Amino acid sequence: MKKRQRIVASVMTAAMTLSLLAGCGASGNNGGGASQGGASSEASGDTTGSKTGTMVFAQDEMQEKFSPFFAETVPDRTITDLSDVTLLTTDRTGAIVYKGIEGEKREYNGKEYTYRGISDLDVKENKDGTVDYNFTLKDGVKFADGQPLTVDDVIFTLYVLADPTYDGSATFFSLPIKGMEEYRSGVDTLFNLMIKAGENNKDFSKWTEDQQKKFWTDYNKAAEAFVKEIVDTCVANGLNKEGDSISAVAANYGYEGLKSDATAMDFFNAMVKKYDGDVVAMSKAESAGSQFTDLMDSYKEFAVGVSTGKSAPNISGIQKTGKNTLKITATKVDAQMIYQLSTDIAPLHYYGDPSKYNYDKNEFGFPKGDLSSVRAKTTKPLGAGPYTFEKYENGTVTMKANKEYFDGVPKIANVRITAMAKSDFVNSIVTGTSDVNNPDFTNENADAIKKANSNGELSGDKIKTVSVDALGYGYIGINTHNVSVNKEPGSEASKDLRKAFATIFAAYRDLAISTYYGDRASVINYPISNTSWAAPQPTDDGYEVAFSKDVDGNPIYTSGMKDEDKYAAAKKAALGYFKAAGYTVKDGKITAAPKGAKMEYEVMVPGGGTGDHPSFMIMTEAQKALKEIGMKLTVNDLSNASDMWNKLQAHQAEMWCAAWQATPDPDMYQIYYSDTKNGGKQPGGSNYMYQIEDKDLDDMIVQARESTDQEYRKTIYKACLDKIVDWACEVPVYQRQEVTIFSAERIKEDTITPDMTSYYKWYAEINNMQLAK
């Protein structure tokens, strides 16, 4: 698995992957820059040219996938955010701006801001249930090379994302757009077809014998390398010993039953079989480091599509309606769709071939099924954003001001984005090696910032600090299958077992979070970020403190209860849940476990082996409390977080501590949808973590997706959250703050993006920033 995409500890970076984001992780609508509105009402609108100087932004290591189509990690996505503009833009609350051409005035924090973009959008719900998204593009917008941005560039971009061979992280192709399925059918990649045909295939009507030999040579080599990464990871993390058989490693990776003399290919094929022959899907879920497609030398050669049957020549729901207008028709209401339409716009003349574009003849800038021209530009992006890419060298990207930027030429001539260890972020501001970065907001870093400033505050003469609620939240996860009774994860007994642990964990949240974060984080009671409009508020009807009722539904705590009494009450309530789960209770302790349950469980905490994690204190205190009532809790403080993700992928984890990243829309499909109606064949991409299986929850998640009424959806999501809490598969822990720090000596403070939020990052108005010297 890609460790850089994982969201661990107090560092909430995307994934994605998970696309934890809808359209996520790599989609432009979540992250920053161009998607967050052009300049605010304070913008000067200066288009006369940029001034001199260079600003340095420090961030994590980049992977050099700077393509709007194929960027996977947050650091890579930052580059495309600066180089591109998006079809739609969002405001400081994450809401879509519909009238970007003239700009929309919206109030935030008592101030009025104007949000501008490259398009206007009109949404019309039709009587037949379809929905029309009518776009009008702003005149005069140009790419950094001076070429105009037109509706043809938008159409080209959408067809790349919809291509049957597209394998990036965006999921535009999954939207209910009229004609999408018909366009994507009847085409498959050589890669997939050759796998289906097998190594001994004798039919060479679609490829040559030499191609087949090359394919299988490279495929088998990549498979061996893929398995080796798993073996090395299992050995490095103590799951296996050096020299253990492939069978032994596979068993610890969730693939038991292989023969004792199994080979690496046997293991690889077993993984592929689990995913119904889909190697790419298997790789995304099971990788211990590299993706299979990156390990296979000739993958791009075989990623082209070939005809396998009837296929529509176009997507009927994407229509060019005028010189600068476009209509996209959805077959039904989908609350996620508007955010997925906020995609980066890529220039046809750069990523495609203008000679192969003729809208009336169903030609869209590249041969259908062949994205080679797009893939060729992965390391060197071009767009219409505030800065234009120059080079990537020695871990540093150099960019220069885009003199064609539609919302005013940036005041700072150059930007360098350099890879740096997070531990060096604060000191780099002091020493002058960076001007802007996002350090972890730990006690240590907060103290270092205060020490650097002569006034002893977080903002002073050396460093200016801006904090916002992080776009996500911390949690404790409990796998429903591995912490269950009689192998029935959805039974009341199993839920009671998990509630016993959850009750104890919840009792120590206030102590642990205040100790670790001080006033820089707060305890939350529902598994959703406080930044979301769907998050229940203490003043809402039905709001409850998480896991604060006993097995009979009575309150565990009373107002004004002392901490010692609170912890004692939690232990008593937990004992009640253990008893209800089927445990034998004698003299205030559990003495025997029911079938399928245990007297000892493990929780993994990625604290670096030093306990450096916000939930570590919860676990050490819970360990002592549970011991007093007869349950042994093993707290595994991991020096390498990949061990935790490996166990989760292999369905071996019992309990763990981590964090989720959020998106502007609170859709719960990715994490909780289990696809019970189809036997779990297509669950949400992260459902494997909790393995929650609930038809009612599935139905509500889909129901919420099919409405754009925010109040209605909030009601549905509250019911979803209550259902998730009842499963006790997730204990909500904290909403933390994240910070951006600036050099007070080198950046003009009054030009920094005002009223930054979780959705409106520091570079949302980077074109207005100025250097002090």
Describe each model-derived feature in a short phrase.
Residues 89-95, 273, 280-325, 329-334, ...:
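Gly/Pro-rich hinge or "lid" segments in bacterial periplasmic/extracellular proteins
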Residues 59, 390-403, 416-484, 514-518:
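Extracellular/periplasmic solute-recognition and catalytic clefts
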Residues 58-128:
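N-terminal lobe/hinge region of extracytoplasmic solute-binding protein
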Residues 119-289, 327, 428, 490-493, ...:
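Aromatic- and charge-enriched surface segment that lines or borders ligand/interaction sites
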Residues 1-53, 234, 586-594, 770-773:
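Short, low-complexity disordered leader/linker segments with a strong preference
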Residues 390, 398-400, 492-624, 632, ...:
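Append "and occasionally in soluble cytosolic enzymes with long acidic Gly/Pro-rich linkers
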Residues 51-61, 132-135, 154, 326-327, ...:
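Short, well-ordered beta-strand elements
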Residues 74, 79, 334-335, 502-547, ...:
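Detector for C-terminal structural segments
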